[in-house]
UniProtKB/Swiss-Prot annotation:
GO terms for biological process: response to wounding. The record marks M34, S35 as: Reactive bond for subtilisin. GO terms for molecular function: serine-type endopeptidase inhibitor activity. InterPro entries: Prot_inh_pot1 (IPR000864), Prot_inh_pot1_sf (IPR036354). Inhibits both subtilisin and chymotrypsin. This is Subtilisin-chymotrypsin inhibitor CI-1B. Residues 1-28 are annotated as: Disordered. It holds the Pfam family potato_inhibit. It comes from the Eukaryota. The lineage of its organism: Eukaryota, Viridiplantae, Streptophyta, Embryophyta, Tracheophyta. Keywords: Protease inhibitor, Serine protease inhibitor. Belongs to the protease inhibitor I13 (potato type I serine protease inhibitor) family. Gene3D superfamilies: Trypsin Inhibitor V, subunit A (3.30.10.10).
Amino acid sequence: MRSMEGSVPKYPEPTEGSIGASGAKRSWPEVVGMSAEKAKEIILRDKPDAQIEVIPVDAMVPLDFNPNRIFILVAVARTPTVG
């Protein structure tokens, strides 16, 4: 069996900051590659009532739909070290 270590799952890319029926923005493709903190700042500008959760890219996410919840998926790029 092939090792999946170091691989990042591919998620479908939303189209140009998808806009929902209400006219509210529903996705933020422009934050891909940014730090979680910067992405959160940008998302909160567009959706101040968002409940943002920063989670590892390979984590299980709840399947219940919450229109105010936004997941920011992150991958650790280097080994964390003390000092």
